């Protein structure tokens, strides 16, 4: 993962952790947790692609990796929908900037995970 993406994840997570949205903090904490898991998944998938010989070990270690991949795309779509939902409701500029950047990052990560997964297939 390039340093800009790492910084973006860290920055967004840090800013989200300081927010109190009008919706429940449980929803925001859930989003933060999913962002963190998505970052870890994206990193591990990227490392597997870099080692390229890991395709067989990845498949043998986890025969359901395609199902996991599908689940991650579902999580990304949910996070995108949540970011868009928050953007339509909030007028707070700090929140708008944070969730616009989160949305952009999610779209970039989705594209990267698709690229990695096609390389592994």
Curated annotation (Swiss-Prot):
InterPro entries, A to Z? Flu_NS2 (IPR000968)
* Role description: Mediates the nuclear export of encapsidated genomic RNAs (ribonucleoproteins, RNPs). Acts as an adapter between viral RNPs complexes and the nuclear export machinery of the cell. Possesses no intrinsic RNA-binding activity, but includes a C-terminal M1-binding domain. This domain is believed to allow recognition of RNPs bound to the protein M1.
Tell me which Gene Ontology terms the entry assigns under biological process: exit of virus from host cell nucleus through nuclear pore
Q: Name one GO cellular component term.
A: virion component
Q: What is this protein called?
A: Nuclear export protein
- Cysteine-cysteine disulfides: none
**Quaternary assembly:** Interacts with protein M1. May interact with host nucleoporin RAB/HRB and exportin XPO1/CRM1.
Q: Which Gene3D superfamilies match?
A: 1.10.287.230
- Spans traversing the lipid bilayer: none
Family assignment from sequence similarity: Belongs to the influenza viruses NEP family.
Residues forming the motif Nuclear export signal are: 12-21, 85-94
Subcellular localization(s) per the UniProt record: Virion; Host nucleus
Q: Cite the HAMAP family for this sequence.
A: INFV_NEP
Q: What else is known?
A: Average number present in a viral particle is estimated to be 130-200 molecules.
What species was this sequence derived from? Influenza A virus (strain A/Mallard/Alberta/827/1978 H8N4)
Q: Which UniProt keywords apply?
A: Host nucleus, Host-virus interaction, Transport, Virion
Q: Which SUPFAM superfamilies match?
A: Nonstructural protein ns2, Nep, M1-binding domain
